[in-house]
Design a protein with these regions (language model features):
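Bacterial N-terminal signal peptides
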Residues: 16-29
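Ligand-recognition surfaces built from glycine- and aromatic
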Residues: 194-220
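Extracellular carbohydrate-recognition regions
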Residues: 33-55, 213
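Short tryptophan-centered beta-strand motifs in secreted/extracellular beta-sheet-rich domains
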Residues: 39, 101-103, 164-179
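Short, solvent-exposed beta-strand-to-loop segments that form ligand-recognition rims
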Residues: 180-199
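Secretory/extracellular carbohydrate-interaction modules
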Residues: 80-142, 146
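Short, aromatic/His-centered strand-loop micro-motif at the edge of beta-sheets
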Residues: 146-167
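Extracellular glycan-recognition surfaces and repeat-rich motifs
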Residues: 46-77, 84-85
Length: 220
């Protein structure tokens, strides 16, 4: 299946890609591994190779590579400019049980929400963990999504000014989850709702228009 055909199949509004399908041509990360992706070699205006977009709930997500002079690693960023309940973009060929995920993000616009987040242990569009920072509410939150329903584990007030770059990082091992924003740990929590390996990716909410760059992930 060609890349163009693959990307067209990924753009269903209520996409639920099972992890097994995402890993069909990939490799499992059994040993320590890390990678950083800057989107700088991908074509502007397209969904980057090896990524799958979708939404938990309803809506029309739109994840595209765009030029941005303010990008932490120039020249490109990955921008979510569509709208949906919870739009996500997942790196396929990844399967991490214990490790980390990190991204730089900038909240650009949104009247209902201005959020940037990361997902991990992603099984499909309805089952995963998510941590996000919100520029409208000025807080950092930790959730799990199960059977398509998002549940709050913890949220903490934190400064998240819009139109500025921030670094969101999550470290996870067994039940332990640590969420940091701009190098400061805001949440440490134990939870076991989503166990076992899963994919990693990025996440937004509602009408958030958010730019992402330097997406990093690794296994322990």
């Amino acid at each position: 299946m060609g890349a163009r055909r693959f990307h067209s199949l990924c753009r269903f509004h209520s996409l639920k890609w099972p992890l097994a399908l995402l890993l069909a041509t990939g490799v499992f990360m059994h040993s320590s591994y890390a990678e950083t992706i800057g989107f700088d070699t991908d074509a502007v205006g397209t969904l980057p190779d090896s990524w799958v977009e979708g939404v938990t709930g309803r809506g029309t997500p739109r994840w595209t590579v765009e030029s941005d002079a303010s990008a932490p690693s120039k020249p490109n960023v990955l921008k979510q400019s569509g709208a949906g309940t919870f739009p996500w973009c997942v790196r396929h060929r990844t399967s991490i049980e214990d490790g980390f995920v990190e991204v730089k993000f900038k909240a650009l616009a949104g009247t209902e929400d201005r959020a940037g987040g990361v997902v991990w242990r992603w099984k499909d569009g309805d089952n995963y963990y998510v941590a996000r920072a919100n520029a409208l509410e000025n807080n950092v939150s930790l959730y799990y999504t199960e059977a398509g329903r998002r549940r709050t584990l913890k949220y903490v007030d934190a400064p998240v000014p819009a139109n500025k770059w921030h670094t969101l990082r999550v470290e996870f091992s067994g039940r332990r989850i640590r969420v940091a924003l701009n190098g400061k740990t805001y949440i440490e929590f134990d939870d076991n709702h989503i166990a076992g390996p899963g994919a990693v990716g990025m996440w937004t909410k509602a009408d958030s228009v958010t730019a992402f760059d330097d997406f990093s992930y690794g296994s322990k």
